[in-house]
Amino acid sequence: MLKLMGSLVLLASAAEVIASPAAEPVAPSTTLEKRAPCTFSGSNGAAAAMASQKACSTIVLSNVAVPAGTTLDLSDLADGTTVTFEGETTWGYQEWSGPLLKISGKNIKVKGASGATLNPDGARWWDGQGGNGGKTKPKFFAAHDLTSSSSITDLHILNTPVQAVSINGCDGLTITDITIDNSAGDTQGGHNTDAFDIGSSSNIIISGAKVYNQDDCVAVNSGTDITFTGGLCSGGHGLSIGSVGGRSDNTVENVSFTNSQVTNSDNGLRIKATKGKTGTIKGVTYSGITLSSIRKYGILIEQNYDGGDLKGDPTSGIPITDLTMQNISGKGAVASSGYNIAIVCGSGACSNWTWKSVEVTGGKTYGSCKNVPSVAQC
């Protein structure tokens, strides 16, 4: 009897163990470790910033001296990082292709503090040849793959060796109140100092830019939904589409240049489609543009670009459609040796244009316009 009762007790205990619920597993914490604010300065600042970039929530670059032949490479930033330049950022001299600065990431905020300057001291490379020979010159700022509402604000860039800002692979980038001042290059051999070269990018807004240079103020080589507004362009080649054609991406669509001024420049407004190539230029708008002191062409639209303007017969492989030119003020703007408006289109390749309140005078009438849409003047 005792044995029976003992067995029953053991069975009951076992049943309790079996019936007891298993302990709840502990879920791993979903709270990410907070990233720290970081400040870097001096000759070791660039290397330290690059090594620590993933761990910093904010990066302050205070009077950083970047060594010669080095890219200040901030292309591995954590999402949402803010990068602020303070004081003067400088770069050592070396002949190489660059870039001197590279920034990439999602929801990245790049800012210039009051009085801050990014100064690559491009005059050390200037020789009048730009990217066509002479010294090998580094491009300045590769703003590549900046996405998800990234922004660049209040930068002051002084004297780039050649091109200033390359925008490529970006989607949702806003650039506000940036100054690119290469005006010293007018007398010291600056060449190919494009301010903004844009390719394969979408949803780009550049607002309030001030540009003094010796090449395109803006060149949109490919991309969609791009706006340049409230800008000043002085000394260069004006507001350009292209050249389009002969690249991996040859589509330009929905690009607007509005409420801006082009002065002291070779060209005012220019659209360049490369001869013998294919692509698309659609939905480009120039509106509310003031031209003054233009040396060569007030408005130049060409489908025979071949490394130089107006080379031979135009071709039709890159149609220019849905173009709008309106409220273009350029009375007396063009030098007497220049041309007010030149339009050279391939057969049937320029269509559905809007042309309203366009006044560009002071220069000569171009005598070799071709296939001009009836609404336009040439």
From Swiss-Prot:
The keyword Ribonucleoprotein does not apply. InterPro entries: Glyco_hydro_28 (IPR000743), Glycosyl_hydrlase_28 (IPR050434), PbH1 (IPR006626), Pectin_lyas_fold (IPR012334), Pectin_lyase_fold/virulence (IPR011050). Its EC number is 3.2.1.15. It is found in: Secreted. GO terms for molecular function: polygalacturonase activity. GO terms for cellular component: extracellular region. One of its GO terms (biological process) is cell wall organization. Residues 1-19 form the signal peptide. PROSITE patterns: POLYGALACTURONASE (PS00502). The active site is at 215 (proton donor), 237. Residues 20-35 form a propeptide. It catalyses: (1,4-alpha-D-galacturonosyl)n+m + H2O = (1,4-alpha-D-galacturonosyl)n + (1,4-alpha-D-galacturonosyl)m. SUPFAM superfamilies: Pectin lyase-like (SSF51126). Keywords: Cell wall biogenesis/degradation, Disulfide bond, Glycoprotein, Glycosidase, Hydrolase, Repeat, Secreted, Signal, Zymogen. Glycans are attached at residues 254, 327, 352. The keyword Glycoprotein applies. PbH1 repeats lie at residues 147-169, 170-200, 201-222, 252-273, 281-303. Disulfide bonds join 38-56, 217-233, 345-350, 369-378. SMART domains: PbH1. Involved in maceration and soft-rotting of plant tissue. Hydrolyzes the 1,4-alpha glycosidic bonds of de-esterified pectate in the smooth region of the plant cell wall. Belongs to the glycosyl hydrolase 28 family. This is Probable endopolygalacturonase AFUA_1G17220. It comes from Aspergillus fumigatus (strain ATCC MYA-4609 / CBS 101355 / FGSC A1100 / Af293) (Neosartorya fumigata).
